[in-house]
């Protein structure tokens, strides 16, 4: 896919919130890439000096195609899009793209995996990792909270529902800990539909004030932005306000349209997100 076949637009030009005709034969042109830099400019992130590394992990639950004899195959899939790719893929377009496999014939799951990897890599502008598992072929998934401290039971008053980094602060004592909250709610950049999820913050550095962190997380409640952009905003705000020596931020959003999106951003390449799935996924 090149930019003349599928030119880059802002999110407002995407299929989100618009009636579309569903295609059931393979159509890679349905993928709609959006330049990450359009929103990174808002938080002072330069493409040539990213303050983080990481990836966007997508889980796909509604993937099907026909085998060479016309019999349907169903499968699960996982996509790992590096955070340093220049483009993200809009989620409704990815759903429409995956639906286009429904009446298309492929030799086997490996052929499907190769097609998806080729198309997503072209859309994102970098190598995207793809795994496809026919049912029963994937390791059992683990549902659990992150290893850390849930801050949701703190008794705090809250009246701010747009992102406010001034709610964040840190003390003098240096600690290593993971804090997380299930109270994350953001909204689709285009449609305003609510997106629900868990967000975790793992850091080494001055102790982050937990009440302030909870207020800050809740302050995204009326904010319209894509999942990936929200996590990058959280990472940058905590970096600026709390000055951690090491930091990782990840979110696990609930499923929509047969897909869930789980962005992960970290200060160091040796860090990994907890692979356990959020109970609402």
From Swiss-Prot:
Q: Please write the reaction equations for the catalytic activity of this protein.
A: 7-aminomethyl-7-carbaguanine + 2 NADP(+) = 7-cyano-7-deazaguanine + 2 NADPH + 3 H(+)
Pathway field? tRNA modification; tRNA-queuosine biosynthesis
**Lineage: superkingdom:** Bacteria
**Where substrate is bound, by residue?**
89-91, 227-228
A Pfam family annotated for this UniProt entry: QueF
Residues of the active site are 188 (thioimide intermediate), 195 (proton donor)
Ligand binding (NADPH)? 91-92, 256-257
GO cellular component, as recorded: cytoplasm
Tell me the keywords, alphabetical order: Cytoplasm, NADP, Oxidoreductase, Queuosine biosynthesis
Predominant location category: cytoplasm
Listed GO biological process terms: queuosine biosynthetic process; tRNA modification
SS bond list: none
EC code(s) of this entry: 1.7.1.13
Q: Where in the cell is it found?
A: Cytoplasm
Q: Name one GO molecular function term.
A: preQ1 synthase activity
Instruction: Describe the subunit structure.
Output: Homodimer.
Q: What does this protein do?
A: Catalyzes the NADPH-dependent reduction of 7-cyano-7-deazaguanine (preQ0) to 7-aminomethyl-7-deazaguanine (preQ1).
Under HAMAP family, the record lists: QueF_type2
Matching entries from NCBIfam families are given as: QueF
Q: Which family does the UniProt entry place this protein in?
A: Belongs to the GTP cyclohydrolase I family. QueF type 2 subfamily.
Descriptive protein name = NADPH-dependent 7-cyano-7-deazaguanine reductase
């Amino acid at each position: 896919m090149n930019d003349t076949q599928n030119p880059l637009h802002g999110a407002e030009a995407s299929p989100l919130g618009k009636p579309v005709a569903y295609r059931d034969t393979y159509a890679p042109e349905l993928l709609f890439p959006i330049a990450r830099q359009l929103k990174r400019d808002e938080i002072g992130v330069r493409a040539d000096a990213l303050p983080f590394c990481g990836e966007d992990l997508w889980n796909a639950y509604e993937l099907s195609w026909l085998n060479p004899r016309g019999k349907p195959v169903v499968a699960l899939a996982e996509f790992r899009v590096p955070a340093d790719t220049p483009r993200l893929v809009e989620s409704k377009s990815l759903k429409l793209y995956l639906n286009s496999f429904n009446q298309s014939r492929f030799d086997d799951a490996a052929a499907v995996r190769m097609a998806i990897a080729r198309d997503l890599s072209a859309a994102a502008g970098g190598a995207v990792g793809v795994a496809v598992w026919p049912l029963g072929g994937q390791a059992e998934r683990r549902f659990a909270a992150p290893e850390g401290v849930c801050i949701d039971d703190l008794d705090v008053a809250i009246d701010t529902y747009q992102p406010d980094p001034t709610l964040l602060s840190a003390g003098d004592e240096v600690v290593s800990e993971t804090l997380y909250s299930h109270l994350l709610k953001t909204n689709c950049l285009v449609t305003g539909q609510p997106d629900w999820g868990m967000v975790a913050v793992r850091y080494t550095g001055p102790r982050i004030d937990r009440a302030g962190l909870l207020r800050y997380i809740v302050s995204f409640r009326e904010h319209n932005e894509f999942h990936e952009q929200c996590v990058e905003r959280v990472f940058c705000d905590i970096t600026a306000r709390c000055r951690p020596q090491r930091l990782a931020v990840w979110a696990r959003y609930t499923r929509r349209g047969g897909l869930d999106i789980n962005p992960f951003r970290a200060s160091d390449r040796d860090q990994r997100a907890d692979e356990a799935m959020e109970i609402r996924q």
